[in-house]
UniProtKB/Swiss-Prot annotation:
Keyword Oxidoreductase belongs to the record: no
Name of the molecule in the record: Large ribosomal subunit protein eL18
The UniProt record lists the keyword Transferase: no
A Gene Ontology term for the protein's cellular component: cytosolic large ribosomal subunit
Gene Ontology MF terms: RNA binding; structural constituent of ribosome
Domain of life: Archaea
Keywords, alphabetical: Ribonucleoprotein, Ribosomal protein
Species: Archaeoglobus fulgidus (strain ATCC 49558 / DSM 4304 / JCM 9628 / NBRC 100126 / VC-16)
């Protein structure tokens, strides 16, 4: 891994250790995707979240959430970062924007988490 962002390196290490400790393969997959080059990281629009996520479901995006499209479902979205428009659209729909670390603390087993890339 040749990441220069110390926060990202720490996040990847924490995700891998929590994945092993809690037998949660979703966190290992998220860590592996975050370890890839930035140009290969996920860029997910809110329209894709609207299409595939169920109301009140946890969604994790190992990358950035972008604001193209609309969303009407209240969804809890965890991502590395959000555009301003994406965050406001998710909040207006009754959803929650959070960091991946926050979702990991809230749901260490990774059950009921949908991975979007």
């Amino acid at each position: 891994m040749r990441k220069s962002n110390p926060n990202l390196v720490t996040l990847i290490d924490v995700l891998l250790s929590e994945s092993a400790k809690n037998e949660a393969p979703v966190w290992k997959e998220v860590a592996e995707r975050l370890a890839k080059p930035r140009r290969l990281q996920a860029e997910v629009n809110v329209s894709k979240i609207e299409k595939y996520a169920k109301p009140n479901e946890y969604v994790v995006v190992p990358g950035k959430v972008l604001g193209s499209g609309s969303i009407t479902k209240p969804v809890k979205v965890a991502a590395l970062s959000f555009s301003e428009k994406a965050a406001s659209k998710i909040r207006e729909a009754g959803g929650v924007c959070m960091k991946i670390e926050e979702l990991l603390k809230e749901n260490p087993k990774g059950s009921g988490v949908r991975l979007m890339v």
